[in-house]
């Protein structure tokens, strides 16, 4: 009995079966993969063996590609771009699905472009150039870490030992240049840098290498980073030995090229030349696969990490091919339409085929994840293999031994990374350590890694050539041009505590007419023009970003200085006049007293009497003119004339004195409007600052003061002048803002000023060095040691306490005191009239005395005989004149009248003779 099936249903079922049930494609019997690399190279010789072994193992594993055989086709690039490119095209003609290699980074750049154009995967096991990026070369993969990863390990090693500056020696090709560029980037992250670069060509002769290394010796750092391709000759170390650069002062760090080279050497005697060199070696974890591979190739002792990566690369491509075949994708090839247009040329590019599923194979390779003999094979971002640890190797005279391990997340340790992970440690930064290292010269003590200076190349130190406050630092203005000052002495004394010799020279900076700008000083240290700067340099954040400062050797802070009011008002009544004017006024009273007494003595009874009475009358008369009308009246016209002028002068003096004293007392009672930086900031008065210092930057940017308010000043003389002029006069200021050491020196030399408010913006003075200079740390330690002695106080006393160290100012005469020159005109008039009156009086007395002497000669009255000696006669004459002047004017006139009457009436001759002798009162 047959089944009745509807034909339409049968057809539908057949279609569903065809669409749903997968059909296995015909697996190819043979799949070609290509390899382009330098056969006759340190890496190439080992890699060739590893590649052949890998293909053999893949084909022997029947559970893997099943009946498909993997065939390896190899072309020798000879580290040549042209030969490498030609070899790549040769392989493409033979229908390869993927290509392995090359070793050379320069060849890798070219073949990566070919892979990009023809869409086939290119997998390198040794091209470590970090610029071979997935963005630029999307079909390029590598199963070895790039140099950026290796440089990260090397920089951690540099940072582990505290070195900040290095010299890089590298091959002048893509590998060397781009590797050192990655090193520079990693060093920058650690605040370190490459001080000098030595590019070397593979064709450089011994003379060139010698000159290049010899030139680098003049640079301070002694840490050398070597980055080349493997060099079996190791010429660089022979030359370094000849130049005595393999001593205890030097550090030689090599990337993994050295370990690859050493693994290929059969003569261990070569190690003697490399004593103390430290390098990196890719860490290959122990595994069963590794043991099996090592046992299989035990006859080949030149095997290295890159050869192991080559072995894993073959397996990785095999995994990708297996994934493609399992998905039923056929291995097919096509001619490139672009290359078909080249038909007929001698290059025969039309024969080149490309794999149709190249992009799919690339996707499968990127998803590969298996454990190879070199470790885990898995790609991360940037299409670089994930994870790679390094061994830190050290060369002694007889062997190469491992002193530790490095991992990206774990840092350094003497325990292998696999062991640490098994102990479930997640952070090893605090436990970082390495084993004992033999350094160049055979020592175990870590080299300092740099030389500050030597006699041939001393430390160049720039110092400011100050023209004000020269006690701190300046250049002597004589033939010696010696640099001296407080800061210089501190530096020299601190340098004695540095545990090594530092030859140095001082070079002054500035035009000698004004103090230099200290920011320019710092910038020159940053730019490498000078190695350090010594002087009164304030440590401020903007400068600390450019240079490294030592420990402050002097504490500073900004302070506000204003004119001071004297708190002691005991002698305030003397301030309106200068001391010179007071002396002149006092002398004037005495002179007027004497002149009036002389003019009034003969005719005024009030000015006669005993000498004591006359002296008191004379002084009281003169000084009482200040306060009230005199009891004694002047009689003579000459005395009245003198008194008129004197009283006028006295009136002007009194009025001026009263006005000035009132002003002083008023100001004395008014409190200063400026009490500190806050009140100064709130006001609009002009402010002085020292030109060239950071004060201007702080006042404008930090406190927001208008630049128009700020007046640059450059010396203590300008400070004093500006403060005395005050804010109302052009060029004057209400206050000065400056650092405390300058102000202390200013107050020690200039009095009449004071500090108001508390110091602010507390900073210090330090010595500036180039960034990451080790001398900055050693000088800081030296300054701390110096401060524990009395030497720092002695230096301060020597330079800053020449006048006084009290820091408090004494009173200075008022700026608006009245001087003698203010009354010079009045005094000249008074002196002229007084002298004239006195001369008139004297002439009158002489005339009367002459007449009196004639009367004596014509009279018959006997008189004393004259002395024979002229001197005695002159003295007698003077005494007679004084006695004559002392007589009353009335008696003299009466005598003269009687003499005149006797001449007219002879009868009176006897009477006159009787009265010829002048009466004495």
From Swiss-Prot:
Complexes and interactors: May form heteromers.
Extracellular side: 26-580, 662-822
Designated name of the protein: Glutamate receptor 3.7
Underlying gene: GLR3.7
Example of a GO MF term: calcium channel activity
Tissue specificity statement from the Swiss-Prot or TrEMBL entry: Expressed predominantly in leaves and siliques. Also detected in roots.
Keyword annotations from UniProtKB, A to Z: Glycoprotein, Ion channel, Ion transport, Ligand-gated ion channel, Membrane, Receptor, Signal, Transmembrane, Transmembrane helix, Transport
Record localization: Membrane
């Amino acid at each position: 009995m047959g089944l009745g099936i509807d034909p339409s249903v049968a057809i539908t079922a057949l279609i569903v079966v065809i669409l749903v049930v997968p059909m296995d494609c015909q697996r190819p019997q043979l799949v070609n993969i290509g390899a382009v690399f330098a056969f006759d190279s340190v890496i190439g010789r080992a890699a060739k063996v590893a590649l052949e072994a890998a293909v053999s193992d893949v084909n022997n594993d029947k559970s893997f590609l099943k009946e498909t055989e993997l065939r390896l086709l190899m072309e020798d690039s000879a580290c040549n771009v042209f030969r490498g490119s030609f070899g790549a095209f040769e392989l493409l003609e033979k229908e390869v699905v993927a290509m392995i290699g090359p070793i050379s980074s320069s060849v890798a750049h070219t073949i990566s472009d070919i892979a990009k154009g023809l869409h086939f995967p290119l997998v390198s096991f040794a091209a470590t150039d970090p610029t071979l990026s997935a963005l630029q070369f999307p079909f390029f993969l590598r199963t070895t870490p790039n140099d950026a990863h290796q440089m990260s390990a090397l920089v951690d090693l540099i940072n582990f030992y505290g070195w900040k500056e290095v010299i890089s020696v590298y091959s002048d090709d893509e590998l060397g240049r781009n590797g050192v560029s990655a090193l520079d980037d990693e060093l920058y992250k650690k605040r370190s840098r490459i001080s000098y670069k030595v590019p070397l060509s593979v064709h450089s002769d011994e003379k060139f290498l010698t000159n290049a290394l010899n030139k680098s010796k003049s640079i301070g750092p002694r840490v050398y980073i070597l980055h080349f391709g493997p060099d079996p000759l190791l010429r660089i170390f022979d030359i370094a030995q000849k130049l005595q650069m393999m001593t205890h002062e030097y550090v030689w760090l090599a990337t993994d090229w050295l370990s690859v080279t050493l693994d290929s050497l059969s003569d261990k005697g070569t190690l003697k030349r490399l004593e103390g060199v430290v390098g990196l070696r890719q860490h290959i974890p122990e595994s069963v696969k590794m043991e099996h591979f090592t046992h299989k190739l035990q006859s080949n002792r030149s095997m290295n990490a890159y050869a192991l990566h080559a072995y894993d690369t073959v397996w990785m491509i095999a995994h990708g091919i297996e994934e493609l075949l399992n998905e039923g994708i056929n291995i097919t090839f096509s001619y490139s339409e672009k290359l078909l247009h080249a038909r007929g040329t001698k290059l025969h590019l039309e024969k080149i085929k490309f794999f149709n599923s190249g992009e799919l194979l690339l996707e499968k390779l990127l998803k590969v994840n298996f454990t190879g003999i070199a470790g885990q094979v898995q790609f991360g971002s940037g299409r670089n293999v994930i994870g790679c640890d390094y061994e830190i190797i050290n060369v002694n005279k007889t062997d190469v031994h491992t002193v530790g391990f490095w991992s990206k997340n774990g840092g350094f340790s003497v325990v292998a990374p696999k062991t640490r992970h098994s102990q479930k440690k997640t952070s090893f930064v605090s436990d970082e350590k390495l084993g004992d290292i033999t350094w160049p010269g055979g020592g175990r003590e870590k080299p300092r890694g740099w030389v500050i200076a030597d006699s041939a190349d001393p430390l160049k130190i720039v110092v400011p050539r100050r023209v004000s406050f020269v006690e701190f630092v300046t250049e002597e203005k004589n033939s010696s041009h010696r640099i001296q000052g407080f800061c210089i002495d501190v530096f020299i004394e601190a340098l004695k505590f540095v545990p090594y010799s530092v030859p140095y020279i001082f070079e002054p900076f500035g035009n000698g007419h004004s103090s230099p700008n200290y920011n320019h000083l710092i910038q020159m240290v940053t730019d490498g023009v000078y190695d350090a700067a010594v002087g009164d340099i304030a440590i401020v954040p903007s400068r600390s970003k450019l240079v490294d400062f030592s420990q402050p050797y002097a504490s500073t802070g900004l302070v506000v200085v204003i004119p001071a009011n004297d708190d002691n008002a005991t002698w305030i009544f003397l301030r309106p006049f200068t001391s010179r004017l007071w002396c002149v006024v006092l002398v004037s009273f005495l002179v007027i007293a004497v002149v009036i007494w002389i003019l009034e003595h003969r005719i005024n009874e009030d000015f006669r009497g005993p000498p004591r009475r006359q002296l008191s009358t004379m002084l009281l008369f003169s000084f009482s003119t200040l306060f009230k009308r005199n009891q004694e009246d002047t009689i003579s016209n000459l005395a009245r004339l003198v008194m008129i002028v004197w009283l006028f002068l006295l009136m002007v003096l009194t009025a001026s004195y009263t006005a000035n004293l009132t002003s002083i007392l008023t100001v004395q009672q008014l409190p200063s409007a400026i009490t500190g930086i806050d009140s100064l900031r709130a006001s609009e008065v002009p402010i002085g600052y020292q030109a060239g210092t950071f004060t201007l930057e702080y006042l404008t940017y930090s406190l927001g003061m208008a630049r128009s308010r700020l007046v640059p000043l450059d010396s203590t003389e300008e400070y004093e002048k500006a403060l005395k002029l005050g804010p109302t006069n052009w060029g004057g200021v209400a206050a000065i803002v400056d650092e405390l050491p300058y102000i202390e020196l200013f107050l020690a030399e200039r009095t009449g000023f004071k500090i108001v408010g508390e110091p602010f913006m507390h900073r210090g003075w330090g010595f500036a060095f180039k960034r990451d200079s080790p001398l900055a740390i050693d000088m800081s330690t030296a300054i701390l040691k110096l401060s524990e002695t009395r030497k720092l106080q002695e230096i301060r006393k020597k330079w800053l306490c020449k006048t006084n160290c009290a820091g408090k100012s004494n009173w200075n005469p008022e700026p608006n005191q009245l001087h003698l020159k203010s009354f010079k005109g009045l005094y000249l008039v008074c002196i002229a009239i007084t002298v004239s009156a006195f001369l008139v009086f004297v002439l009158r007395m002489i005339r009367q005395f002459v007449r009196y002497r004639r009367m004596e000669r014509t009279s018959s009255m006997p008189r004393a005989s004259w002395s024979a000696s002229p001197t005695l006669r002159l003295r007698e004459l003077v005494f007679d004149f004084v006695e004559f002047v002392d007589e009353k004017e009335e008696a003299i006139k009466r005598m003269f009248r009687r003499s005149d009457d006797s001449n007219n009436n002879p009868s009176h001759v006897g009477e006159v003779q009787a009265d010829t002798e002048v009466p004495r009162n």
